[in-house]
Amino acid sequence: MSGFFGVTSKKDCVFDLFYGTDYHSHLGTRRGGMAVYGKSGFERAIHNIENAPFRTKFERDFDEMEGNYGIGCISDSEPQPLLVRSHLGNYAITTVGRINNLDELVQQAFRDGASHFLEMSGGNINATELVAALINRGSTIAEGMRLAQEAIDGSMSILVLTQDGIYAARDRMGRTPVIVGKKEGAYCVTFESFAYLNLGYTFEKSLGPGEIDRITPEGAEVLLPARDEMKICTFLWVYYGNPASTYEGLNVEEMRYHCGDALARRDNIEADGVAGLPDSGTAHAVGYANRSGIPLVRPFIKYTATWPRSFMPTNQKRRDLIAHMKLIPIRSLIENKRLLLIDDSLVRGTQMYGTTNFLFGSGAKEVHIRLACPPILYGCPYLNFSRSASEMELIARRKIAKLSGEHADITPYTDPDSPEYAAMLEEIRSELGFTSLRYHRLDDMIASTGLSSCKLCTYCWNGKK
């Protein structure tokens, strides 16, 4: 994943830009960047943040940069923001999304006269550079952003910094949020709504799907109105959104309480304590405990000072190491106890296997696993939130292949009342060593959001676009 933040202010914007961008650090662990526009023109800094946090890497830039307009990003892929000089003028650009037809668009750009694209390490082309090339096909920034989004198969939200303000475009299907905040003399635009709260901003608006606005210190001007159809990523609430954020009027923490509540209403397990796997599983566990009456406990504590999210690193051994080292057991709360552990999801199963062994090794009598979303059956074609190289890395798909063959019809396994679904769960439970296993039902999860199912993307669970 990635996240971005932008500021337009009548005063220097660097303070707000620095901290607003930093508040997106949970969305990526590879690179951070900031670009500002002021009296000296455009300034930009990009740093690798794999081994040090954003604030540490950008301290010097924070002291040296100045300007009234700025954009920043936390990126889990390409370096950005990029500085661009084109017939549209000079600008800086940052993006959040995924381009599935990148090679096709690059070849089309060559046919249209583009001479080259800079290659990143690993042989990949910077997707943000390609987006800039697509924007440059337009006669204006706004028209170019529209053309870029129409050409892209996948999803793409964009911030473009110019001397006239920040142009903000939300993905055409609204898969990721773009939110505008305001305070006296300044407006900001952000992925995470909580990122501006401690900076003194209040909520102004959410851009609708495909909407393009120009943000200035005076306000947000709509250049292209929103489309009606929306498919916002449901996994925002389940896992990778910050608990303090609100999307489409629904707070992440509250939605997780609702998920836990719904899980408990369909469960009848006896346990000595309910625990959430930190951090995203914690709120789900609160909802479960409140509904079930089973005490909420913390049998392990997350050491937050230095360990990042284990979901992010590309290397499996690195992910497993982080998942293990960041959790410190409290043996007196584990030994001889029947524990019910809730996590947001189960992707490959390696980390939950390690956590279960960790609890049994610390003396747990039983370990019951509850997941706050349905089995993940498909890789996401819209956002880079999963590091699985293929769908056969997904533990649910591996078990389906074992039961019915690699090319089996998946449909029966999406029905939580079917015998095929029950067989898949038993295969997963047995391999990972859980005492019992239950997933959140898709219908219950959708109900937990309070939003219409037609507005939510559920592709990774049921394959429906």
Where are these regions (language model features)?
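A conserved beta-strand->alpha-helix junction
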Residues: 121-129, 296-309, 403-408, 434-447
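PRPP-dependent phosphoribosyltransferase catalytic core
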Residues: 164-165, 200-206, 356-465
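Generic beta-strand/beta-sheet core signal
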Residues: 94, 161, 169-170, 181, ...
